[in-house]
Amino acid sequence: MNDALLRALSTVNDPELHRDLVSLGMIERAELSGDVAQVKVNLTTPACPLKGQIELDVRSALLQVPGVRDVQIEFGAMVRAATQPALPGVKHVVLVGSGKGGVGKSSVAVNLAASLARDGARVGLLDADVYGPSVAHMLGQGQARVTANEDRKMRPIEAHGVRFISMANLSPAGQALVWRGPMLHSAIQQFLKDSAWGELDYLIVDLPPGTGDVQLSLTQTVQVTGAVIVTTPQDVALIDAARAIDMFRKASVPVLGVVENMSYFVAPDTGLTYDIFGRGGSRKLGEQYPLLGEIPLDVEVRKDADAGAPAILAHPESVAAQALRAVARTLAGQISVRTLSELPEQLPVL
């Protein structure tokens, strides 16, 4: 490490954490080769939404060092685990919930997982909606079956870079499950602890609607980084979303933010915007919790889900896909802020 370069880098703050890159441990390499400064910066998440700003700030700071005429920046990523990791090898467990059904929660969960994976993170997706599993179908793996490895642990199925477990891949198609609370609790325990998830940066959990046994089992079984609430602008959905938020508060699960799905509709023939389910309701919740994003109502998102391809991959240029990508990156940033804010302050490099 070159001391002069480190001193310059210690003046560059992470825009979200408001601490310098050196004290945060984000500088892996800082060397001077002739008049070229060569540095490697490990971002807090592969989905860092402020990578461009960090690159500009690093370049500007290093060009102020005497003798430096050019800067070469390599970016890596190192997702830091929560203070108390949730499961062996799993850095963060993120719950995706809603107060009621029909708000597009599973679609959001699938696209969040696929987006994080596309950005380079190691992602798992647990379909905890035991009575109405839909993740497997949305990932194009409705006919696949879960198998066991040599340690007799369930081997997650992989699709679009995401490892997932769903009851749809364990029970016969069309068969209804009539389980009481203890059986649900046992199933959730198995999904979490008897599955060979491997090393994951994020395990996204698609919860069933409401505030029932599955939610309680999850919050009692593993250390959860936080929850994302999916709602629509409709008043009745917002009322139920508030109940879900209250449940997580009582279970001491941090609410990372709110996603307003089906926020508006843009007519493809006229370009006019229609607020089919109302407008701005989630911003009231956002006064207490971050509004992670507003996803427009888009028929292609539904078609892509039916076809087994996340919208962010099938139609990445669409407004809905871009909004979902932005939500995933904002969520990753929220997790990084929460995790790194727990680090002790370090003295700056002198």
From Swiss-Prot:
Keywords: ATP-binding, Hydrolase, Iron, Iron-sulfur, Metal-binding, Nucleotide-binding. It comes from the Bacteria. In the N-terminal section; belongs to the MIP18 family. Pfam families: FeS_assembly_P, ParA. This is Iron-sulfur cluster carrier protein. Homodimer. GO terms for biological process: iron-sulfur cluster assembly. PROSITE patterns: MRP. Binds and transfers iron-sulfur (Fe-S) clusters to target apoproteins. Can hydrolyze ATP. One of its GO terms (molecular function) is ATP-dependent FeS chaperone activity. ATP binds at residues 99-106. It comes from Deinococcus radiodurans (strain ATCC 13939 / DSM 20539 / JCM 16871 / CCUG 27074 / LMG 4051 / NBRC 15346 / NCIMB 9279 / VKM B-1422 / R1).
